[in-house]
Design a protein with these regions (language model features):
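A nucleotide- and high-energy phosphate-metabolite-utilizing enzyme signature
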Residues: 1-208
């Protein structure tokens, strides 16, 4: 056992980040159930449960969480990515007696994804007999507090192409998929990777 607390910090940081990721995974499962059953405010649809199942959501760790350097007083910085689940090709899909697989529009993805994020946040941070697990902070997302809580990969790409500032590219250095859809998280990581390294050629990148 290491006797020096300072030497232990990298290991502790990794374990805390992994614990936060597991908590977010659990909170997302709770959120999916709540939203599907109509327990939260907002979305109302005849096929509500099916709509929730038709949405992929990935949680991207940022800052200390993304870098696996979390400490006991850190916020858990995240951004959220959504996408419609691609309906599986089945022989009977859409035939008489079989309902067609639900394919969500981008607006529907945004609506349902936002509901899921609100429910997830309540599960982790809401008042309860036990203290909140973590302060989950999504303010590193594009446009900060003024921006939408969830975006598609394509929406993130357009933002980073057109409007992102140098510090936002620097923040992406620590971005890491930590919960939710692993496939969607990997797609987000592949999409933003070029921006991280190409941004070094931008004017005043080092000074910022």
């Amino acid at each position: 056992c290491c006797e020096d607390p300072v030497e232990m910090m990298p290991t502790i940081g990794r374990h805390l980040a992994d614990l936060a990721a597991a908590a977010l995974e659990g909170a997302l499962a709770i959120a999916r159930t709540e939203v599907a059953e109509g327990l939260g405010p907002g979305l109302a649809a005849p096929r509500r449960g099916e709509a929730v199942d038709a949405l992929d959501l990935a949680i991207i760790g940022m800052g200390k969480c993304g870098a696996r350097e979390l400490n006991y007083i850190s916020d858990v910085d995240v951004v959220y990515v959504v996408a419609p689940v691609e309906p599986a090709a089945t022989p009977n899909a859409g035939t008489e007696g079989e309902s067609a697989p639900l394919k969500l529009t981008e607006n529907e993805c945004s609506t349902i994804g936002t509901e899921l994020v609100h429910a997830l946040t309540r599960a982790i941070m809401g008042p309860a007999p036990e203290p909140a697990l973590w302060e989950v902070d999504a303010n590193l997302r594009p446009e900060g507090k003024d921006g939408p809580l969830v975006r598609t990969v394509e929406s993130y790409v357009q933002y980073y192409k057109r409007w992102a500032e140098n510090w936002e590219f620097q923040a992406l250095l620590k971005a890491r998929p930590i919960a939710g859809s692993a496939q969607l998280g990997a797609r987000y990581a592949r999409a933003i990777d070029p921006f991280v390294w190409e941004s070094a050629a931008r004017e005043s990148f080092v000074e910022s």
